[in-house]
Each structure stands twice: as structure tokens, then as C-alpha cells.
Amino acid sequence: MDKFVKLGQDMVLLWSKYKVMYWAGIWNTLKLAFLATLIGCFIGLLCGVLNTIPYTKKDPLPKRFLLKLLRIIIRIYVEVFRGTPMVLQSVFIYYGLPYFSNNALRFDNIFAAALLIVAINTGAYMAESVRGGIISIDPGQTEGAKAIGMTHFQTMVNVIMPQALRNIMPQIGNNYIINVKDTSVMFIIGFTEFFAQHRYIVGVNNMYFPSATIEMIGYLTLTLIASLILRLVEKLMDGSDSYELAQGDQLVMAAGTYSHPDRGTCLLY
């Protein structure tokens, strides 16, 4: 019991002395995770849509070649960034680009570098989620859209993506929560997120475990709040549970009528 009391006292001491640094780290973590998830979603949507562009043997050879090449590039991108740790991706992007370009390509803004790294990583995961969400939609809806003259882009924007987004919304939320935690590796490039502040504070006073406990409580609080908000968003997207079923055969009731914007429902003769 004395150890827990001592731990609590050390945590209070650390928080009272370094709370400004802790809060700054929390803000940087939330900002990076939110923006990276947002950009990663756009990357994933783009890759998912491009990866599902249909083609047949009747299409021109250049079109088939370009689409196959595009799918290969997307597949390599997804496999590389899903199959390697983000900390190594950070090293290769932040330190590797200046190394191979003789400092012609280097980052003057650490936040921009961190944002690029996390966004690209998130985009690789979202690309597969979007592809799965698109495939999960009934193919008959795509065929129906084509039957009325819609292009692939129009079909995606107006028919498929509104439904696919609802299906992948939980995955978007999961990626945000993962990013809140995984941004802790950005200390490797010098970005001062929540965990980087912990490393600095520990280096000053050597109170490692009390500071780590503050970090754990902080990350847990951030992820729990994010999970709660995401559940509320999903409920709002589901709509109201209270509704009334239409009585009778609506097709029979509407047969031979049309809806006029000024006169209401009129009979057709």
C-alpha cells in the first residue's frame, strides 16, 4: 500500500511540475492522429476506387495495361506499408530521403514529416478497407447504375461509396485510435508528441515509472473518449429506431399516378 501512495505522490509531483509539457504532447498527438487519419482516408478512398475500376478483354490494350500497372503499384504500396513497422518507415522516409538525395530532399518541418509518414501508413490500411467495402456492395447495384448510363465514377460517387462508407466507418475509427497510440514512435524523428514529452521528463528527473503511469492513463483516456464518440457517430448514421411500417401495398396504391411538384399526386390517363 505504501508503494501505491508513493506512486500517487510522485505522479502528482510530476503533473504539477510538467503539466504544460504533458498537455502540449497530448495536443500534438491528437492533432497528428486526426489529420493523418483524415488524409489517410482520402488516400485509401483513392486507392480503393482506382483498384476496382473494371476492365475486360474487349477494352483497348493501353487501358488494360495501365489499369494492371496501377493495381500492381497499389498492391506493392499496401504490402510494403502494412508489412513493416511504422518506426522503420519513419527512419527510411525522414532520414533515407536526404541520404539518397544528398540532402536535396529533406524535411524542414518535423510535423509535416510526421504527418506524411502516419498518413501514408494509414492510407495503406484504408485502401484494403475501402476495397473490401466496395466489394461488399451487391453487384446488382453497379449493374443497375450502368444500365441507366452512369460512368464508373458516377456509380462510385452516387451509388457505391455512400453505402461502402457506412460499412467501413468502424475501421476508420479503429485507425484513428491506432494512430493515437502509434504516433508515439514519432519521437524517432524528433516530433514532440505525448510519449516524447515523457522521454524528456524522465531524462530530467529519472522518475520513469510514475511518468509512464501518467502516460498510460493519458493514452487510455484518449482512446476511451474516441471510442465513445465513434459509437455515437455510428448510432447517428444508423438513424432512428422508431418508425411506422406502411400499411397496404404501396405499389398498388401508386399505380397510375405521378407526383407533381405543385399539384401533388395526379392520375395518369
Feature roles, as predicted:
Residues 1-268:
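Transmembrane alpha-helices and adjacent helix-loop boundaries
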